[in-house]
């Protein structure tokens, strides 16, 4: 039995070292927004910033002013109130009276065969005037030169679609463990640097920042094609790639900021609708997704504590490598590398988030989102 543990931890250590090397090389290939010179205003195509807001009265007063304070010469902001029950619409109208940059679109009903968010973003697109469309969320904050630098980056690389990785504010050990591990899996596990290669089939999209050429958006089908996609942000990147357009990912941890969820319970609740959807509502894929955190983060820690001899040595190498890779990703994200020590806890939480998403979705027979229920059969039939 001891020789089997030596072989197991030796394999995990080797895979960890190779993965860490590939991750390090890959992350260095991603362009950083802060290193991009802003576009010249006399060469700036028009941009429409579009976001949907449902019951966002608490967060809008902090985020919306940053969208209206851009140094870019030709842009507008289209805010879509999606059937809010709080003061969201009043706040939007108040800002619109103070700024000619802001236009408010009010959605009062949700048509059949649409998710609320995708319908609201589609409604925003239909009134937007820009040559480029920037989809974001109602709680995201921008620095004043984000548009100028993002457009310069997209044009310099010849991209039709640019996703920026945002900085996420985190507080408390449990929240840090859950979000930082989720972020590491998203960045390192998915190998997002492959997206920037034209021949790669890899795709990406995050709700905080997606800048897309209007032609690419329309020819790919836009949010109408994603009407029942729970992870519409990721799938927008997919359909743009499928339509033959060029897509890229950049880093804007300082320039684009968001407080994703407050507290670990809200983090777990917030991804319950997403995790199973990201795995195509496939139970076997979900079961397989539980294995990497178990193999690379949890069992090496147990090996260091419980194993002996070479098995413990290899377990230690595997654990140290994963912690170093986690610290490297956190450091690039402007977070303390010491948060990497929460990696095994984050792995446990990550596996629980997947398991909970599968169990809740199957138990309910679908997804409940913002007081609306969407049957699982219908969601599966309309996946891109």
Give a label for each model feature.
Residues 1-41, 180, 192:
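N-terminal membrane-anchoring/stem segments of glycan-assembly enzymes
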Residues 154, 158-188, 215-218, 223-285, ...:
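Catalytic donor/gating beta->alpha subdomain of glycosyltransferases that bind UDP-sugars
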Residues 26-29, 103-126, 149-219, 224, ...:
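Long helical/loop segments within the catalytic core of UDP-sugar-dependent glycosyltransferases
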Residues 45-48, 76:
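Cell-envelope/extracellular polymer assembly enzymes that use nucleotide-activated donors
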Residues 41, 285-365:
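Membrane-embedded multi-pass helical conduit in multi-pass membrane proteins
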Residues 87, 136-153:
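Acidic donor-binding/catalytic loop of UDP-sugar-dependent glycosyltransferases
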Residues 64-111:
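Acidic donor-binding segment of Leloir-type glycosyltransferases
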């Amino acid at each position: 039995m001891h020789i089997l543990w030596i072989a197991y931890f030796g394999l995990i250590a080797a895979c960890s070292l190779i993965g860490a090397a590939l991750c390090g090389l890959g992350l260095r290939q991603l362009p950083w927004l802060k290193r991009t010179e802003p576009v010249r205003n006399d060469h700036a195509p028009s941009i429409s910033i579009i976001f949907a807001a449902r019951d966002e009265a608490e967060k809008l007063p902090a985020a919306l002013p940053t969208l209206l304070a851009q140094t870019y010469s030709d842009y507008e902001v289209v805010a879509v109130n999606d059937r809010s029950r709080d003061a969201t619409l009043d706040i939007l109208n108040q800002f619109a009276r103070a700024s000619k940059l802001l236009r408010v679109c009010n959605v009062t009903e949700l048509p059949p065969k649409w998710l609320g968010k995708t319908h609201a973003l589609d409604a925003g697109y239909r009134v937007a005037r820009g040559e480029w469309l920037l989809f974001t969320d109602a709680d995201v904050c921008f620095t004043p030169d984000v548009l100028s630098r993002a457009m310069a980056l997209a044009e310099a690389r010849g991209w039709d679609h640019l996703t920026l990785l945002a900085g996420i504010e985190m507080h408390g050990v449990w929240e840090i463990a859950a979000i930082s591990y989720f972020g590491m899996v998203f960045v390192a596990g998915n190998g997002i640097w492959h997206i920037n290669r034209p021949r790669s089939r890899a795709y990406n999209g995050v709700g905080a920042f997606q800048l897309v050429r209007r032609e690419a958006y329309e020819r790919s089908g836009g949010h109408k094609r994603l009407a029942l996609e729970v992870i519409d942000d990721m799938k927008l990147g997919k359909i743009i790639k499928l339509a033959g357009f060029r897509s890229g990912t950049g880093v804007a941890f300082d320039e684009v900021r968001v407080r994703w969820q407050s507290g670990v319970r809200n983090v777990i609740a917030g991804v319950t609708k997403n995790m199973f959807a990201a795995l195509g509502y496939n139970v076997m894929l979900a079961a397989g997704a539980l294995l990497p955190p178990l193999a690379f983060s949890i069992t090496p820690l147990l090996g260091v504590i419980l194993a002996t001899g070479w098995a413990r040595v290899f377990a230690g190498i595997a654990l140290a490598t994963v912690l170093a890779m986690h610290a490297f990703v956190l450091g690039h994200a402007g977070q303390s590398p010491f948060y990497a020590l929460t990696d095994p806890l984050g792995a446990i939480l990550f596996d629980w988030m997947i398991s909970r998403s599968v169990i809740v979705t199957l138990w309910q027979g679908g997804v409940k989102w913002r007081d609306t229920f969407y049957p699982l059969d219908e969601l599966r039939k309309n996946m891109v």
